[in-house]
Every structure is written in C-alpha cells, then in structure tokens.
Regions:
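Core alpha/beta nucleotide-donor-binding catalytic domains of modification enzymes
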Residues: 1-191
Length: 191
C-alpha cells in the first residue's frame, strides 16, 4: 500500500505549513516519513511538534531522538516539556488537554497538523467512551478532520490498522520509540 496516497488529498500547492505531532512512536514516524518522501514534489514546509510529557524515565531520550531525526532531515522542530505531575488523577485527559493547547499555540493560519491516529485508536476510543457511560452522540469515532485554533487537524491513517503501520515501518527500516506505557494497564487506554 502506498501510504503517501492517503496524504495527497490534504496537500495543496500553496504556502501552507504542515506540522506532524511527533511523539516518537511508530505511528507518527511513519506519517512523518511518508511526508518526507513527497516533500519535494509538493514543496512542503514541514515542521514537527514533540511534547515531552515528563512522566517517563526515557522521555528526554525520546525528545532527543525526535530532535535528531528532524535535524538530519531538515525539518523545523518544536519541542515543549510539560511540568512534572504530582496529581495523577485523570492524567490522560490532563495531558491531552495540555497537548492540544500547545498545538493550538503553534499552528498558524491555514496550517495543518497531521496526527498518526489509526483504526485501532478509533476502536479503543469507542470502547473507552462506552465503558464510561457516554451517551450515544458521544460514541462517535475520532474525526478525520477538525479545526484547532487557526489551523486544522488531519488524521489520514484512521482507516489503517496498527499492524499495517508496523509493517510499513519495517519495510522502510524506520527506527522509533517503543513506549512501554502502552502496555501499562493502569492507563484506561491499555486496559
């Protein structure tokens, strides 16, 4: 499968800036790599935004890993580090809210922020919301597109599974961060 075909509908030959939410994980690295492959054909101004949540012991290594990849590939790199948390109640929501505030503060007019969410994330979100007793209208899936401040969020991989993304990373010999918290059942998303 040609993953870049999923991106092309969102690329305009205009003076837009395209950002990638770069966690360091496989989803965001495959996404950024696909944009790199077509950057010259579309004259893309690429930037990456990395948020260091400051809760994992390896978070500084991940930040540096992302920074180095961007430096080598001439990608403008934004990095923000969140303050250490002492209150862990509702942590996932708090971190998500902080991430989106940062994204919104960086996006400029008409810019696009690509995010690496995929089909497995959509299924996970549906079940998490249903377990929490969300009303029917709240069970809608993760939107492929939505506005955020002056820009727009695009999730081009929502029809792909995690397995397909991992396969693509292997084909392209991509290195990425393996976040062990993804196996930690104390986070609702992993339960």
């Amino acid at each position: 499968m040609d993953f870049s075909e999923l991106l092309k509908p969102y690329l305009k030959k205009t003076n837009k800036t395209y950002y990638v939410a770069l966690s360091g994980g496989v989803d965001s690295f495959v996404l950024l790599n696909e944009l790199l492959k077509i950057r010259e054909n579309y004259d893309l101004k690429l930037s990456a935004i990395h948020i260091n949540h400051n809760i994992q012991k390896n978070s500084l290594k991940w930040k540096n890993f992302c920074s180095e990849f961007c430096r080598k590939n001439h990608i403008k790199y934004f990095s923000r580090t969140l303050r250490k948390k002492t209150d862990f109640s509702n942590l996932e929501k708090k971190l998500r809210d902080e991430r989106y505030k940062i994204f919104e503060s960086i996006l400029d007019k008409n810019s696009i922020l690509f995010m690496g969410h995929h089909l497995d994330d959509t299924i996970e979100t549906f079940f998490l919301r249903s377990m929490r007793g969300t009303r029917l209208e709240g069970l809608t899936s993760i939107p492929k597109e939505r506005n955020l401040g002056k820009g727009k969020i695009i999730r081009p991989f929502l029809d792909l599974t995690k397995t397909e993304i991992l396969k693509k990373a292997k084909e392209d010999k991509l290195k990425f961060v393996n976040d062990l918290s993804n196996r930690d059942n104390s986070f609702d998303r992993n339960y």
